[in-house]
Amino acid sequence: MSGNSFGKLFTVTTFGESHGIAIGGVVDGCPPGLEITEEDLQVDLDRRKPGTSRYTTARREDDEVQILSGVFEGKTTGTSIGLLIKNKDQRSQDYGNIKDRFRPGHADYTYDQKYGSRDYRGGGRSSARETAIRVAAGGIAKKYLKEVHGIEVLGYLSQLGPVTVDKVDHSVTNTNPFFCPDESKLDALDEYMRDLKKSGDSIGAKVSVVAKNVPVGLGEPVFDRLDAEIAHAMMGINAVKGVEIGDGFDVINQKGSEHRDTLTPEGFSSNHAGGVLGGISTGQDIEVHMALKPTSSISVPGKTINKDNEEIDIVTKGRHDPCVGIRAVPIAEAMLALVLMDHLLRHRAQNTGVLSTTKPIAGQA
């Protein structure tokens, strides 16, 4: 299996399966001298880990990360950073009934067709369990971005089913189990999720993430456009079915006179483009939104086929998130941080010392 690595100069490679002994990863390209501890990485891992509220899967994992290499006396050495998280709460017996059945909406059928075999226990390599390592690696990137460049990456749940946030207060996001930035929507979210769990069904969601204080100039103008690589990163998250940068699909109904972000000596008058023009960051906030499908692992009976191509009934057992979008918030933050970290290093490698004759303008007037 290829495709286990992400990034060019700041590279993350992950390994492991949902019900294996452990999951792990290697981070290459981190500059030396960054102060980092396991506790630093644990903050976002605790936000992502399962079993923390009634609204997510009942599987309980501590998700305690171990730094195996690349850090000495509390600082990065510039060598490969090894990360490991042990799996503790697997219940592989819950999946015995799907050994020869293909769960609809999952990777069971495609893995079987591509590899001729599959790890049916919790989805194996296709499980979102793997994203815990992305979050740990993203924690390294987030710390570097903030401490060295003042860049902050902030994610939140912007919609869950029919419940949409009306305002964004980042100080509220991490005070509730939904990562919702609108305090007035918490009761509606709670009521909706309680009813959903009783029905045994699941629901989709929209997650948003913004990067603040990003400098102008990150990204390459052709194949490695900053927005293209952000979309690549977000589409690589389990269950993501669509990504928008800035106004996204709303631009269909916009006129050019409305959509263009006017430049003034004081700064940009708007940010419809989401902080990227021509594949290069403008210095404005980078705004990203993604749609996540409802999980297909539900207790509502359905139809599928088995390995003998016979139509059969299926009810998925196991412990699953009724809305995968909730725990996707720290994952989205991590992936955006990894993209920005990679492009900062690439920009530094090629463009150090480059000066434009035009003075940079503010991100927002």
Curated annotation (Swiss-Prot):
Cellular component aspect of the GO annotation: cytosol
E.C. numbers: 4.2.3.5
GO molecular function, one term: FMN binding
Entry keyword set: Amino-acid biosynthesis, Aromatic amino acid biosynthesis, FAD, Flavoprotein, FMN, Lyase, NADP
CDD domains attached to this UniProt entry: Chorismate_synthase
Gene3D superfamilies according to UniProt: Chorismate synthase AroC
Binding-site residues, NADP(+): 48, 54
SUPFAM superfamilies in the cross-refs: Chorismate synthase, AroC
Cofactor note: Reduced FMN (FMNH(2)).
Source organism, top-level taxon: Bacteria
Cross-referenced InterPro entries: Chorismate_synth (IPR000453), Chorismate_synth_AroC_sf (IPR035904), Chorismate_synthase_CS (IPR020541)
Pathway info: Metabolic intermediate biosynthesis; chorismate biosynthesis; chorismate from D-erythrose 4-phosphate and phosphoenolpyruvate: step 7/7
Catalytic activity: 5-O-(1-carboxyvinyl)-3-phosphoshikimate = chorismate + phosphate
Principal EC category: lyase
Any one GO BP annotation for this protein: amino acid biosynthetic process
UniProt cofactor(s): FMNH2
Bilayer-spanning residue ranges: none
Xref: HAMAP family: Chorismate_synth
Subunit structure: Homotetramer.
Role played: This reaction introduces a second double bond into the aromatic ring system.
Family of the protein in this entry: Belongs to the chorismate synthase family.
Protein's name according to its UniProt entry: Chorismate synthase
Species, as recorded: Alteromonas mediterranea (strain DSM 17117 / CIP 110805 / LMG 28347 / Deep ecotype)
